[in-house]
Amino acid sequence: MRATVLSLFWMVTLVIIVRAQIPESHDEQTILSLPLFPADIVRNHIPLTQALGAVGASVEGGFALFGLELHSTDGQEPIVSVDLPPESRFEDGLRQVMGQIPGYEYEVTSEHMINIYPRGAKKNPADLLNTPVPKFDAVDVDPGGVLTRPADFIPELALRLRPKTSAGPQPSGYGGSVLRSNVTITLHLKDTTVRQILNAASEAMEQLPQEYQPVGWTYLFQPDPESLIGGKHSWAFLFSAPRNWKQHSAKPGPNA
């Protein structure tokens, strides 16, 4: 009887250990294991967004988009380096970059989307990207506009960016570059947040033709205690998809 109990104990313990080594989701397991271009990838002392773009553009057999939230007292990006040997995987590049920006964490949110933000930011109700949006409907809109001028499309965000002494909305920061294209996307979301809307706009670009590479987004917050809206809020694109991204965006059918 004792031997049976001990056997069961070790079986249960083994199952727990094995489960702890399994990635949290299929999406995380898939995207992190993607191989990179089989050559040295070296970039020295470059802005964080460029480093993420370099790692993403080297992905083979898939693609990755980033949603990056940065908090910076001087309005500048962290400077990092990338030094990856051949046979590296996407996870190696991501972890190398993350190791140079202490205080930040990443989350795989979907098949192709990775969010990076200050530790604890996602649970902070004061964070602008966590602004609740009960209903979001955008029909035939330029995805670049949503990513770089989100306050123009999200009334709840525009309200947060309105100084308390102002009679009308006055978004702070800049809108970034404009994606000049003739393509549009349509989004219908309920009980969402600004962060999730930005993610959805990037993910919707997966349906675009080959010549339109999907892009991620960057939100830069520069705190200013004297500002009526807490500081400067800026949005821009984050390029990271390889040129052959479309070859890997279509999911195989049931008979594949």
Q: What do these predicted ranges mean?
A:
Residues 2-5, 9-256:
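N-terminal targeting/assembly segments of extracytoplasmic apparatus and virion spike/baseplate proteins
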